[in-house]
Amino acid sequence: MNKVHKPLYFYLMLFFSTTIIGALLLYLPFTGKKPISFLDALFIASSAFTVTGLSPVDIESQFNILGEIVILLLIQIGGLGIVTVTLLTLVFLNRKISMKNRFLIMVTWNIDEPGGVIKLIKHLAIYSLVTELIGMICLCLSFIPKFGIGKGLFLSLFTSVSAFNNAGFAIFKNNLIDYSSDPIVIITISILIIFGGIGHFVVIDFINCKKLSKLSLHSKLVLTTTSILIIIGAITFFLLEQFNTMQHMGLVEKIGNSFFQSVTTRTAGFNSIDIASINKSTALMLMLLMFIGGAPLSAAGGIKITTFAVAFIFVLNYIRKENNVSVFNKEISDKHIKLSIVTINISFLFISIITFILSIINPNISLIKLLFEVVSAFGTVGLSMNLTTEYHGITKIIIIFVMLCGKVGLLTLLRTFIPPKNPKNYRYTKGQIYL
């Protein structure tokens, strides 16, 4: 086996084994209020560990407090990354971190250099826990008066962890629809999703930077693209849904929920309106946002906003016939341009193939609903048009596979199982192709 591939295989085995252990715990009688099939338990464990949020059952009515804690832990471990949690444990025990383990972190977070890996995971853990704690305290202001101290604290903790890790799991029957008019819940969760979706690197860079102009290119691209997508998404959602799913709301509430749905759609999957009732045009817009996702080095899914931004800038510069691809007075390398184009293409192809297969298996379900579910699973978002509870066996297995591919990354999987070619010492002559 190729030396480079050994850590990748280990990472995948660690990933899959954690999912199986989570499924077994959810399947056992002591974590549930009623029996559950192992496939449903596996689906929920996969959804929690990939921080997706899709579920074939109602979490509150299916699981007791122990089951909900298992889901909470899967979300937290999945958000931080199983490798990150493992290495944090080794650091806590004062164990030496080998180059193999450093390479695992590089694979998990798509880092090019092994230097500073330990510092990275320490900052990541502190940033995550502190932000989740602050979010929990804010949510307590709304949940404790309604549910009491005990349940209110747990609901606040669960929702804060779920929001920051962009999971979208909620221990409420209608997700957050009943809280669409609660500014504390809507604003707090929106902020948690944004901070979880842009990643700790950007936040630390922003805090340490005295001038915005001194921000790194990565931070500038993430913050700019995130802001643009949130604004465009909110305005579009408001225009398309103000007389549909939000017709019963006042103007301020419509604006707040439009902002919330724009934020949560790109990766978190909470919903304050009925997704099954949205217009087809809205569904298409949400699918685009889900496909793009959040930032690298974060809990977010999708192809990543930097991938989208680089590809968009490349196309724009190509149309303008500019030789170099640059943004914020920095040139983008050919390596990153190729990576962004490849990522978008294989992701689009993967989603198309999976949707085609599901359309054959589920001929009675409309194509746009199937496509919505696949994009949601691949982007580890968790929004659903109420189809998740209707999945039969083979469909659930396929969606589990899609969620895992979305979390691990298609390129990581392909590079793991497809051996690299040995570099050639020669080049062929160029041929003519008509496009």
Question: How would you describe each model-predicted region?
Answer:
Residues 1-435:
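Membrane-proximal intracellular helices of multi-pass ion channels
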